[in-house]
Regions:
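A short, Lys/Arg-rich alpha-helix, primarily the initiator
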Residues: 1-16, 20
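Residues in the recognition helix of alpha-helical DNA-binding motifs
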Residues: 10, 24, 35-36
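Short alpha-helical DNA-recognition segment
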Residues: 15-31
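The DNA-recognition helices of helix-turn-helix-type DNA-binding domains
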Residues: 28, 39-40, 65
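Short, basic-rich loop-to-helix N-cap that marks the start of a DNA-contacting helix
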Residues: 38-51
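Short C-terminal boundary/hinge segments that cap the last helix of small helical domains
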Residues: 54-66
């Protein structure tokens, strides 16, 4: 399960909007919002976000326990 609040924080810390990250990972903003709502992203999408957002502790965000 993804910690969406922490991911939103990382997005904001980079001065970006969720729609910017949607474009980065190749989905529409609507699809991105749904993925955030459900807390589910593909491994390729996670990889891109880790790299593009310079996330230092991806385990804490993307591989959190419920």
């Amino acid at each position: 399960m993804i910690k969406t609040d922490e991911l939103r924080g990382e997005i904001a810390k980079n001065g970006l909007y969720q729609s910017d990250v949607a474009k980065m990972i190749g989905v529409t903003p609507k699809t991105f919002y749904e993925k955030m709502k459900n807390g589910v992203f593909g491994s390729d999408e996670i990889e891109i976000m880790i790299e593009e957002l310079n996330i230092r502790d991806p385990m804490a965000i993307f591989f959190a326990k419920k």
